[in-house]
């Protein structure tokens, strides 16, 4: 996509986000307001989320440390990362802890493990929402945010839950496997979820220094076939490497060690993608976030109407405003389609079809949940029913969206 076309499309998307808060305020749901705020913030900052995902102890944090060129993120023998950690470019080092309450606290770098690890913050007892780290790294474009996530499949179920909830916020994913063992059933199920939500996935097999060249080739061949079967894509490129060796080489400025780690092949491919394809993927990801938000709003309003939780007049006004917003979005989408190449139009159309299907399924699921829940509050007074149903409705919709 040419620069002028990209800028026009991004302006259209930013215009959509200006109206998100208005829509969420009309719906009167704290969960939906929070969702609208997070989408709006990401799009306004033009942030591209490169999310590193994988099972616990695959070496995700070590690989990110290589990208940063420093031992910044805690690593160790036990499962460590317990909260979402975002690293963005900054000329100076800065660490902010954002709590679930919305309060932000700046901390020294050497206190990072007190908030982002199981050792320092077991089961997230400190109620940390995310950690944001500003760091002067030159590995990627300055608008790229590297996201470290808790490993799935450990004894800490909350870590798995946090990571699953972040998948749909990803613009591109680095999926980290390793040679010990190659790919597990847990990882296969995890990858299935990722492939449903993310268009660009880089596959890394870490710890390649722990086995022979012949065994690596066998592992790559086996893993490639498994991934093809899961993603239904024929062109799968896997990068075997040693993140630990690469990091040690970078810190000690040992070029021979870096070359031996095989990380440079992955690094070159990633940089090329960020240079040539990032813009298209980012637009598609932003459109998908907006579509997902509209699906949540639509489901909320439809269920409000069915349950008559809101006064009918207010519901009708909200639905009318929502439909007007939908019409504006669709009109602007038409302009976006004209600016894209033919193949991109096909991709966007498939997105629309997929999201329409998701919206319909969402309404059915939410309605069933509400119907199943209603008997538990049927004997309460009307005002108490409304209060319980409102809370349950918000929770059910956000769970489905996550």
From Swiss-Prot:
Coiled-coil positions: none
Name used for this protein in its record: Uncharacterized protein in xynA 3'region
Q: Which family does it belong to?
A: To M.genitalium MG148.
Report the Pfam families cross-referenced here: Dynamin_N
InterPro entries assigned to the protein according to its UniProt record, in alphabetical order? Dynamin_N, P-loop_NTPase, TRAFAC_Dynamin-like_GTPase
